[in-house]
């Protein structure tokens, strides 16, 4: 996608003055990432803000022992302003982001976006609206991890993946599923086996599970 076509997809584009549109155009870039590639984090520079033009990303935090906890998964048409604490200065934790599929992003650097926020009330409202939505997703994730049993979290994840893809089959390894629901690979493997014995899923070759019914 060319930059001109990408810029008009910004939710606040129509609220910018001509000079602001020119400024954004000069400071925005389109970046492509392959599946599994690091988008932000691990000591890299601040990404700024990003609009997902195609594909899907995964945002997560790392525990002290290196375990990944998935926070949210921005997909096509969605914006991400929590890609680093440098965007909203009062954020006291850093998120890491990887490309969950091949994806293309429209990226606006943090300094340029910060200038827009200070000068345009519509952009400022957009920033806090998206931040609020993301924090709601983070809180939902934390509630699941803290208060839902692993079998329920796993069942919900499998159902959501089937809804997302429109298929009754989930092609992921035990390790990948564990990362998504904040658990351990061994726990996921045992739970999937139990689901299969209960007739809820059918486990195929490595990395494939078919949902026979919703749990």
Regions found by a protein language model. Give the residues of each.
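Short phosphate-coordinating micro-motif centered on Lys-Gly-acidic
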Residues: 39-44
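Cyclic nucleotide-binding regulatory module and flanking cytosolic helices
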Residues: 1-30, 34, 84-88
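Cyclic-nucleotide recognition modules
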Residues: 72-129
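Short, leucine-enriched amphipathic alpha-helices that occur as contiguous helical runs
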Residues: 147, 151-155
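Phosphate-/nucleic-acid-contacting segments
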Residues: 150, 159-212
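Glycine- and acidic-residue-biased ligand/ion/polar-headgroup-sensing regions
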Residues: 36, 47-60, 75-77
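Short helix-to-loop capping/linker segments positioned immediately adjacent to catalytic or ligand/cofactor-binding
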Residues: 94-95, 114-119, 137-146, 164-165
């Amino acid at each position: 996608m060319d930059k001109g076509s990408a810029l008009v997809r910004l939710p606040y584009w129509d609220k910018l003055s001509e000079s602001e549109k020119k400024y954004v155009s000069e400071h925005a870039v389109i970046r492509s990432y392959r599946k599994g590639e690091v988008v932000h984090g691990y000591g890299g520079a601040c990404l700024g803000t990003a609009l997902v033009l195609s594909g899907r990303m995964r945002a997560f935090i790392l525990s002290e022992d290196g375990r990944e906890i998935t926070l949210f998964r921005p997909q096509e048409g969605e914006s991400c302003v929590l890609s680093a604490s440098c965007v909203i200065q009062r954020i006291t934790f850093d998120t890491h982001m990887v490309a969950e599929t091949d994806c293309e992003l429209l990226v606006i650097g943090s300094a340029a976006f910060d200038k827009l926020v200070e000068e345009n009330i519509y952009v400022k409202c957009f920033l806090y609206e998206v931040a609020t939505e993301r924090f709601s997703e983070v809180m939902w994730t934390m509630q699941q991890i803290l208060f839902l049993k692993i079998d329920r979290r796993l069942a919900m994840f499998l159902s959501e993946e089937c809804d997302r893809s429109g298929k009754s089959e989930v092609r992921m390894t035990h390790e990948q599923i564990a990362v998504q629901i904040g658990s351990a690979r061994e726990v996921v493997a045992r739970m999937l086996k139990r689901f299969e014995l209960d007739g809820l899923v059918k486990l195929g070759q490595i990395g494939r599970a078919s949902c026979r019914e919703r749990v």
